[in-house]
From Swiss-Prot:
Transmembrane residue ranges: 10-30, 382-404, 455-475, 510-530, 549-569
Keyword Transmembrane helix on entry: yes
Single GO MF annotation: membrane insertase activity
Assigned GO CC terms: plasma membrane
Biased composition (Pro residues): 54-63
The organism of origin for this protein: Acidiphilium cryptum (strain JF-5)
Protein name: Membrane protein insertase YidC
Protein's GO biological process: protein insertion into membrane; protein transport
Amino acid sequence: MDNRRLLYSISISLVILVLFQVIASYVLPPPKKAPPHPATQTAQTQPVSGQPAPGVPAPSAVPPAAAPGGVAAKIPAGPRLAISTPLLRGSMSLVGARLDDLVLTRYHQTVKKTSPLVQLLSQAGTAKSYYVQFGWDAAPGSSLKVPGPDTVWTSSGGDLSPAHPVTLSWNNGAGVTFELKLAVDRQYLFTVQQRVINHGAAAVEVYPWSRIRRDFLPEEPGSFTLHKGPIGVFHGTLHEMGYEGVKSGGKHPAAGDAPGTAYQTTNLGGWAGITGKYWLTALIPSQGREVIGAYRYLADPGQPEHGGYQVDYMTAKPVDAAPGATASTTTHVFAGAKVLSILSHYETQYRIPLFERAIDFGWFFFLTKPIFIALDYLAGVFGNMGVAIIVFTIGLKLVLFPLVRTSYRSMARMRAITPKVQALRERYKDDQMQQQKEIMALYKAEGVNPAAGCLPMLPQIPIFFSLYKVIFISIGMRHAPFVLWIHDLSAEDPTNIFNLFGLLPFHPSALSPFLHLGILPIIMGITMWGQQRLNPPPPDPTQAKMMQFMPVIFTFMLGRFAAGLVLYYCVNNTLTILQQWTIMRGTNAAPRAAANLNAKG
């Protein structure tokens, strides 16, 4: 009767929840997403690096990206420099020297190979304005004319490619030439040398700067398990700040910082940029040069809730060019996919501190990174990330088997004495204290420790969490097929039992997110139920009844999880069943063998 009531309660709760989702979708208006909103001209008067150090000038204004009131400005017309590498394709605007058009040639927006390529950087004035820019500020009190946002640069000719560097130049008409010497490698790294050539009779002092500007939020915000937004290494320490944190900090800057500054510091080298789940755009200054780095939120004065996010660097000390001399600084720009081997290569080659940590390995990075490397290696060996997950899970279970064997043996012994425990509960059901005393005495007599089954499992928790993290963040999992109907291990199982696996022409998940249950989560639920059947029931009857529904609950919970993670649980549960069954057979065989020997004696 109690089981029936519990089942009724859970069923009614699920029905109410689903009905609420359905009714709410029709009655309540859906929340409106804030439109992508480039910052206005007024907002663009924000300096690059906020309040500078003593002797450092206030840098020039950020280039206009929109008209007042939030209406996107016309995309700046003018000449462009084409960019072509094995992994990148795009162009750079010669008006303002903005790197603002870049696609990743190996990654598509959807699993279909005919879908558009991933657009990493986009032009100012578009709905998803996202660009990198370089410039100079003159020293305080100087009348030196420096390039501005509308400056039209002259290219040395040809497209920018790994085999063909390009130089952009501009003469200020007063004897000073500014140059941007651009080079790009075969992967994702640009090298930008900012040169000032002084043909005049007086010395020149300038402050080179670089910035990344993003005027829209990602469709899926960051979460507890994944950071999105500004990221960098300052003073040898990784510093992450989410979009909301930058926005809040920019509205309330620290004393001495310019408006919009959420974080600012002066240090040697390091790196800073804006990261997503799979992609990164980062500025990497010379590691031996003192620079001012900052995260900013540049609000639209007309609509303070809208604005742009900026990461920038400026030299802390001026760069001097004597008459007839040339002064230069070099900055690297990473713009591409967060592939561990590529990040590691750049970290080593250019001595970039903690550059690998652009991948969000999380708290357990000392575990997550080795798992990440192992899965990537296995995927290369077997040619399939799904097979790599299966092989890795088998290997992990074998390595952990000595640790969990104690737990499985304890659970087997607990299951063997379950009838005796139930008998004691029935006998002393009116005397709880005596009941617990007798049960403890039984445990002692049988040599069973209820906690022994749990303690060996504790060290596994960080490992399993790290594996979940890797499956969630690995770019190797993105659009990686497995077999049959699984075409993307980073996405949920596309099948759904509620439309008879595609036979009915509608999408139940449109009514409620709970109405999505694919084949793989169902298999996972079955394996979880089988594993639960081998475990001894909890001593508390109420807890035991609740545990009966855990496979059903987890099946629905994992219905919207990445197929790669569900595949791991399926394999892990199946191997656990085999291990438990083998140990239980051995544990039960020992008493039977002893009984047979006694009978023969």
